[in-house]
Amino acid sequence: HILRSCFDNKVKKFVFYSCTVMYQSSDTPISEDDFNPSNELLPQYFGVGHTKLYVEKMCEFYSRICDTEFVVLRNSNVYGPHDKYDLEKSHVFGATITKVLTNKDGKLPVWGDGSEVRDFIYVEDLTKRTEELCSRETGPLLIANNGSGESTTISNLVEKIIDASGKGMTIEYSKNTPSFKNKAPINVDKINDILENKETTSLVDGIEKTVSWYRENIETT
């Protein structure tokens, strides 16, 4: 209904937040053109991956028949203030923040061995990029990876969050618990060629901002 409304009301711009879960595991940064629809999606991302791809195709369809400019951002792992910090609903970043900042015994359980690789983008960087893309012409359809372009292992992420918390803590990796053995570095050359401001918040700075926000807004509630 939203896409049809863009068509009916001659909306100038439509931005869809897709993601990178449709990509296969890779040791090298993955570009938009590396995606092969004939490859099976990773089982754990089957539902969300195909849903995102369906909406991407609907954006492509409407881009062919109306004047609306469609922007599809394949976001990496978005993190920061107002993330989901409920352990029943959160992803790896939000869950780790909660586990570290609420920890009482100095032992931090982590699923898997920490070798998974992810790209992370701070939420304010996402909003700034969205605003810039909305303020300029991008053509009928733009599909672009959107992330920091700097991948990190889960073990490195956990260590940085512990450092930012100021707590002394021992990490206990649990290899018998569910973990996703995939690597998801992404190539962000395409979006960087378009953006005037290519800078992104470093992971260390983003974590520190998030820890401060959590302590001011979650721990006090």
Regions found by a protein language model. Name each.
Residues 1-45:
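Conserved Rossmann-fold NAD(P)-dependent oxidoreductase catalytic core, especially the SDR/UDP-sugar
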